[in-house]
């Protein structure tokens, strides 16, 4: 089959090789099962695998009944092992696919199109040059670029770190297996090594035996720095530099260090009582330890490389002056026993001093992790600033005596890392829900005698009071013992921020995110609490300082619609504008994809987010404020997921001003950053998406046709009404959700530290969090939140307008936002399976209501598929992404038995819980099916 998209990084002609390799690893797993567990398990797995493949090819009721009876006849032990077999196969096939993608990119790099693939740095830069972007304009673009992925702990991330280590070793071995120069004996040895890894995969429990702590989640995030990011970050910059040279020539465009990594792990306390101030301190210190270990390792490597002797080179005068000063201050004392040895090797001498200083900082941070307090030695670094200055001095000096090639390798990579990560490794965001701040402020103001009825004040009076208090020289400091425990803990978070800014550096924190922001006063309340901790106030010369940035998070459909009103009240407040100006005049605004989709469905969420971005940028431009949009995207389509490059390019024209920030959920982290090769690719396509979307800074983009917007407005209204008709106005829908999906059991899977519900209440759409809402529907193969309402909306638009079909087709062809929406929807539809969903519906108690709800969902599913195929001009879903289509289709025959097994186990487990006092023997295998189906679908929530 020819590749329909020459700019794609993968050649479909090579799919046969991929299929053969997947088969090879399936056989390796089969051998392992036979050897470790015996013939009976192997035959059981094969019977199910082959049987469901036959059913996919041609439905046969007798065979389907035979397979269902076979599942029903299995005992608990055999069921568990069958589930583990399929799960292990998914893990292996995912690794093989990732290796295939990496090899195809490398092959294209070596032998293919010189512009590489869509989203590569080279292709992107060349395309922008062809559009008319000059070298000077490209420099302007690059200087404003700031790409900030933010790692989060995902409540439904189903993968253990132990397994990820084994998977990484398998990935590396497969890569080696593809080396053309391998001899027969070497290949056989590698296959034995891989088989050993597969055996360890089989012997390792994929289900956590306990719920992870927040510290476990912090370490989970740090894993990716060790495994890939420390190497990927410098490579990202190198690829951009090569692209600039290719397009514009040498030394025409300088690539700044535009990447920053953010994190919520250890800072996100919204709905998670386990994230305390102490946990936040430790999250920062653990990141610092990781960074400092890496820097020490790299400084050691540089000491071995930069062996220049003063017999042959003369360092720069600036370097010599600095080395002399540092020798006088500490070097002669530290190197008393090595003075002669390093006297003629100036770079080694300085690097040895630098290592000692890094070690002093590291040991202090480790001591603080152990017992909370330790004094930093006088010789140790207090921040990364001096360390970076010394590295740049060495770089400049090396280049002064024509050692630019040496300077441009390991030393430059370390400089890039320090510029990107500092000593803190990542910038930690703090997040808390707005009502927590409101209650704390009300309590403090009442105790201080400043306002006894704050919670009853109208919004305008709140803003006036808060503004006046913020501009005061001093505020009454609340007596902590008089406060409730929650208010005292809320204040302690701000104390911790003030403390850790001193310990870890002024840029250790990103922003303070306020979830469920409904009013401008919610932002002002956070600033008032920050003032009490000394994070803002007046300098001795009466000038203002503000060491905190606040990001309001707009999550629900209603909040998105009121975003202009909230921001207008905020930006017109004199006190707020003064504080914003002194903190850099940058306003970050976060947009929530998960709750808005759960609330109003994918169409309303998508369109209201699109409009909100335009409104926010228009407002901030009006008030002369720089704006950075922070996208709270998840891994699934229902939570804003989808290819990062396409998602960024699809933003409204002229709304991305060089900066973008977005969450990388735990489920996505493993897929993107477990392996170096994939991590470089993912960082690259995200960064080039940002570069493309920001091109309007130098080449103003025309907005898309108003007719597109009018059509989308109409479609979104219809889609939201259809979705709400199902989720809000259909009797029994929430009972159906809780009974016809495994959402009740998901909470027992020990997936994350955060509770799955906001509070323990009756079955209600607004009490369950967005992530388990989407996870539950996905497990039961409904995927409702990601597509429901689209079919009705598209069909209705065509009924209302004679030229409706032509208009929608035009939008699909020429409007990236609309095409991205429908392309992502196709993935969700492709992963749904209505026949299997019907079997889940049979789990519900009230079958009359359940069957009516199922038929409603099935009808909308069929309509949505029909309408999307009609508008896109495709014969089948995902024809426009054939490799992805192939990947998902290949998994179906393996997912089918797992879903039927899960249905059986849900029924047995719930019957046991309802009638027996002892622990259910069916729970453990049921939890394994959740893990296995998540691996097969390649996403959770």
Regions found by a protein language model. Name each.
Residues 22, 79, 218, 222, ...:
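Active-site-proximal structural scaffolding
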Residues 256-258, 262-264, 272, 415-416, ...:
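Beta-sheet entry/capping signal
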Residues 275-307, 533-721:
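Catalytic or ion-translocation cores adjacent to nucleophile or general acid/base/metal-coordination motifs
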Residues 350, 356-363, 427-428, 433-524, ...:
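Active-site cores of enzymes that catalyze phosphoryl transfer or operate on phosphate-rich substrates
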Residues 693, 700-941:
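Long, compositionally biased intrinsically disordered regions
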């Amino acid at each position: 089959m020819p590749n329909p998209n020459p700019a794609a990084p993968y050649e479909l002609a090579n799919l046969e090789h991929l299929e053969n390799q997947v088969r090879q690893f399936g056989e390796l797993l089969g051998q392992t099962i036979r050897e470790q567990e015996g013939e009976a398990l192997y035959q059981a797995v094969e019977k199910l695998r082959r049987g469901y493949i036959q059913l996919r090819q041609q439905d046969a009721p007798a065979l389907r009944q035979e397979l269902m009876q076979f599942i029903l006849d299995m005992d608990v032990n055999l069921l568990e092992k069958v589930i583990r077999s399929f799960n292990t196969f998914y893990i292996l096939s995912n690794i093989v696919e990732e290796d295939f993608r990496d090899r195809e990119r490398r092959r294209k790099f070596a032998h293919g199109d010189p512009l590489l693939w869509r989203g590569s740095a080279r292709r992107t830069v060349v395309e922008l040059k062809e559009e008319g972007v000059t070298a000077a304009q490209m420099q302007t673009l690059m200087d404003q670029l700031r790409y900030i992925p933010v790692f989060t702990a995902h409540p439904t991330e189903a993968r253990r770190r132990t397994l990820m280590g084994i998977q990484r070793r398998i990935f590396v071995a497969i890569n080696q297996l593809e080396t053309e120069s391998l001899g027969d004996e070497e290949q056989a040895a590698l296959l034995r090594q891989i088989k050993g890894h597969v055996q360890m995969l089989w012997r390792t429990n994929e289900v956590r035996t306990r719920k992870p702590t927040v510290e476990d989640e912090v370490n989970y995030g740090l894993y990716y720095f060790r495994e890939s990011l420390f190497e990927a970050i410098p490579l990202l910059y190198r690829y951009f530099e090569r692209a600039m040279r290719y397009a514009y020539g040498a030394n025409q465009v300088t690539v700044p260090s535009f990447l920053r990594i953010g994190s919520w792990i250890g800072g996100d306390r919204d709905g998670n009582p386990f994230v305390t101030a102490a946990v936040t301190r430790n999250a920062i210190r653990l990141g610092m330890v990781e960074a400092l270990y890496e820097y020490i390792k790299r400084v050691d490597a540089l000491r071995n490389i930069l062996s220049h002797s003063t017999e042959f080179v003369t360092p720069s005068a600036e370097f010599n002056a600095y080395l002399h000063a540092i020798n006088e201050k500490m070097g002669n004392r530290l190197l008393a026993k090595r003075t002669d040895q390093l006297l003629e090797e100036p770079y080694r001498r300085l690097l040895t001093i630098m290592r000692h200083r890094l070690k002093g900082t590291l040991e202090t941070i480790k001591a603080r992790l152990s017992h909370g307090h330790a004094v930093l030695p006088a010789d140790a670094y207090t921040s990364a600033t001096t360390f970076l200055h010394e590295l740049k001095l060495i770089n400049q000096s090396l280049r002064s005596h024509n050692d630019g090639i040496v300077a441009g390798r390991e030393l430059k990579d370390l400089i890039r890392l320090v510029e990107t990560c500092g000593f803190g490794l990542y910038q930690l965001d703090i997040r808390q829900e707005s009502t927590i701040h409101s209650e704390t402020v009300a309590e403090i103001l009442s105790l201080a005698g400043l306002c006894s009825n704050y919670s009853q004040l109208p919004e305008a009076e709140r803003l006036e009071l808060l503004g006046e208090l913020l501009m005061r020289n001093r505020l009454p400091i609340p007596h902590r013992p008089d406060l409730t425990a929650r208010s005292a803990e809320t204040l302690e978070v701000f104390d911790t921020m003030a403390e850790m800014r001193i310990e870890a550096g002024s840029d250790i924190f990103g922003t303070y995110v306020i979830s469920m922001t409904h009013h401008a006063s919610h932002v002002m309340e956070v600033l008032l609490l920050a003032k009490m901790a000394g994070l803002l106030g007046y300098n001795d010369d009466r000038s203002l300082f503000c060491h905190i940035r606040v990001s309001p998070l707009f999550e629900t459909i209603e909040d998105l619609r009121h975003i202009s009103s909230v921001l207008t009240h905020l930006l017109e407040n004199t006190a707020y504008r003064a504080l914003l100006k002194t903190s850099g005049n940058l306003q970050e605004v976060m947009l929530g994809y998960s709750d808005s989709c759960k609330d109003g469905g994918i169409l309303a969420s998508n369109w209201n987010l699109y409009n909100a971005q335009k409104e926010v940028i228009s407002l901030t431009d009006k008030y002369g404020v720089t704006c950075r949009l922070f996208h709270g995207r998840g891994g699934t389509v229902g939570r804003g997921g989808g290819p990062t490059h396409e998602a960024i390019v699809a933003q409204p024209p002229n709304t991305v001003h060089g900066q973008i920030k977005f969450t990388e959920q735990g489920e996505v982290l493993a897929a993107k950053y477990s392996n170096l090769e994939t991590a470089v690719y993912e960082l690259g396509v995200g960064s080039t998406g940002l570069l493309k979307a920001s091109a309007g800074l130098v080449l103003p983009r025309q907005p898309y046709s108003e007719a597109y917007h009018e059509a989308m407005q109409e479609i979104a209204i219809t889609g939201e009404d259809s979705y709400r008709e199902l989720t809000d106005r259909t009797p029994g829908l929430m009972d159906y959700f809780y009974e016809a999906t495994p959402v009740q059991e998901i909470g027992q899977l020990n997936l994350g530290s955060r509770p799955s519900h906001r509070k323990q209440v009756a079955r209600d759409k607004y009490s369950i969090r967005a992530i388990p809402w989407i996870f539950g529907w996905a497990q039961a193969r409904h995927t409702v939140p990601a597509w429901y309402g689209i079919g009705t909306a598209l069909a209705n638009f065509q009924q209302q307008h004679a030229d409706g079909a032509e208009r929608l087709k035009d939008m699909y062809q020429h409007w990236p936002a609309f095409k991205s929406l429908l392309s992502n929807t196709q993935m969700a539809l492709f992963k749904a399976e209505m026949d299997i969903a019907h079997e889940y519906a049979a789990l519900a108690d009230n079958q009359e209501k359940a069957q009516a709800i199922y038929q409603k969902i099935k009808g909308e599913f069929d309509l949505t598929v029909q309408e999307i195929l009609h508008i896109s001009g495709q014969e089948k879903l995902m024809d426009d992404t054939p490799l992805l289509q192939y990947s998902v289709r290949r998994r179906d025959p393996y997912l089918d038995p797992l879903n039927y097994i899960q249905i059986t186990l849900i029924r047995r487990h719930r019957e046991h819980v309802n009638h027996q006092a002892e622990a259910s023997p069916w729970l453990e295998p049921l939890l394994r099916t959740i893990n296995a189906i998540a691996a097969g679908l390649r996403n959770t929530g």
